[in-house]
Amino acid sequence: MSDSPVLALLKDLISRRSITPSDEGCQQLLISRLEKLGFECEVMIFADTTNLWARRGTEKPLFCFAGHTDVVPTGPEENWTYPPFEPTVVDGFLFGRGAADMKSGIAAFIIALEQFIKAHQDHQGSIALLITSDEEGPFINGTVRVIETLEARNEKIDYCIVGEPSSTEHVGDTIKNGRRGSLTADLTINGVQGHVAYPHMVENPIHTCIGPLTELSQMEWDKGNKYFPPTSFQVTNFNAGTGASNVVPGEAQIQFNFRYSTELTAEMIIARVVAILQKHKLNYQIKWTYNGSPFITQPGSLTNAVSEAIFAVNGLTTELSTSGGTSDARFIAPTGAQVVELGPGNKTIHKVNESVKIADLEELVHIHRLTLEKLLT
């Protein structure tokens, strides 16, 4: 029995060892199919990252599918039951790195697109794909650079589905219509190193950081709102000491992260943190890394179209959610586009034996096709 079109395409994509930022020919494979559908394909290479902007049509509205061909490293391949770049079907699941995150999303949209254009060659508006090989890496030469290019030439996306694995138990049970912002701090607290037996001659940075860290961890940053939970503060790394039991360290290095709602801005968080550090009279340096602002797509044309398509395919009433980590949607939403994330289940993403349920894959094709029909016919 031969593979279905979406399964065959997904196997082809998974077999390419596209560990970030490598693309390994995945985008050329997509181009070969998109050009047959009348897409103009533009490859944008920035440093070590390969990006694809493909567009069919010039009219509004512009519907875009966004995704990434890069995958995270496998870890020790001997820990995998099946080789991670040799896609293997077992008991209704396809195993391989990128099976869920997110080559399945790309494959499903391509097949849905082929079906849609065959039936609606004169569809309304325009369709585009924005594909990068930089989503799992430092994300500096991928989607953000393509969006900058589009903005410079006033090419505006109206609707965007990002194909990240949004679902939990069954495809379509959850879609992401927003994400929290992310802000990371690398804090160094300076002390005075010395012998542990002479406390009057040292200043222990571990001791001096306890007060401000306790205050930061116990603070209510906001109450959240109808779309977002309250802002969270978490210490992610703490390093101090020489390893010797008789030496007080000269510095402590602490990394912490905020996942914040639309009730706050990065500037507001930074100001409050600095005020606490100064109140405790610390000798410190701090470096901030801004990973993206929170965004929300209000219920409207896009969320309605996707939700109705999901219900029509599998009878599920989808949940709109803003939980989880950041994605490239954070670079697209600020342009004014309506953005949601829709993809397969996320239980095995980044794990050994990553997999996707083949039945979910087939349903995802139908959901994408119906969404296109609702928005562009």
UniProtKB/Swiss-Prot annotation:
UniProt GO molecular function: acetylornithine deacetylase activity; cobalt ion binding; succinyl-diaminopimelate desuccinylase activity; zinc ion binding
Catalytic activity: N-succinyl-(2S,6S)-2,6-diaminopimelate + H2O = (2S,6S)-2,6-diaminopimelate + succinate
This protein's record includes keyword Amino-acid biosynthesis: yes
InterPro entries for this protein: ArgE/DapE_CS, Bact_exopeptidase_dim_dom, DapE_proteobac, Peptidase_M20, Peptidase_M20_dimer, Peptidase_M20A
Presence of keyword Amino-acid biosynthesis: yes
EC class: hydrolase
Cofactor comment: Binds 2 Zn(2+) or Co(2+) ions per subunit.
General function of this protein: Catalyzes the hydrolysis of N-succinyl-L,L-diaminopimelic acid (SDAP), forming succinate and LL-2,6-diaminopimelate (DAP), an intermediate involved in the bacterial biosynthesis of lysine and meso-diaminopimelic acid, an essential component of bacterial cell walls.
Protein name: Succinyl-diaminopimelate desuccinylase
Phylogenetic lineage: Bacteria, Pseudomonadati, Pseudomonadota, Gammaproteobacteria, Alteromonadales
